Amino acid sequence: MAGPDRAELAELVRRLSVVHGRVTLSSGREADYYVDLRRATLHHRASALIGRLMRELTADWDYSVVGGLTLGADPVATAIMHAPGRPIDAFVVRKSAKAHGMQRLIEGSEVTGQRVLVVEDTSTTGNSALTAVHAVQDVGGEVVGVATVVDRATGAAEAIEAEGLRYRSVLGLADLGLD
């Protein structure tokens, strides 16, 4: 996937989301930079690009619902939902079920019996995406694949593909000048 939209998104992510300095990632690993993608996924222009590019990336996958583990997946899913094209609904997987109300682990559109795309903002190990995959599968949803905006090339693709799932990303570290 190439083109002006992808180049513009890469520039916006570099400018808005790449933070240099020693950080501990959610995986527990340390890195010299952090890609705080919420700064891009919640930006008016970047969000529109993410929605279009993620739809383009997964155009050959048949799904009607998109979502993933809160919080990183939430704006990615809604960007896809609002991007031009066929109707796609969204859902959110909580980190744990609510103790009150409907006590649901998955909120939003129904995933039971649906073909589902699981998304992430940034993938490191793939654990967040796989948590969402298993939650969807546990209620009878069929996961068609996992897509992420930025892949850190640190094992997510391998972990997700080891589960028998397809995996794609819009951007890699080289696109952000971080390779």
Curated annotation (Swiss-Prot):
The keyword Membrane does not apply. Its cofactor is Mg(2+). It comes from the Bacteria. It catalyses: orotidine 5'-phosphate + diphosphate = orotate + 5-phospho-alpha-D-ribose 1-diphosphate. 5-phospho-alpha-D-ribose 1-diphosphate binds at R94, K95, K98, H100, E120, D121, T122, S123, T124, T125, G126, N127, S128. InterPro entries: OPRT, Or_phspho_trans_dom, PRibTrfase_dom, PRTase-like. GO terms for molecular function: magnesium ion binding; orotate phosphoribosyltransferase activity. Was identified as a high-confidence drug target. Belongs to the purine/pyrimidine phosphoribosyltransferase family. PyrE subfamily. This is Orotate phosphoribosyltransferase. It comes from Mycobacterium tuberculosis (strain ATCC 25618 / H37Rv).
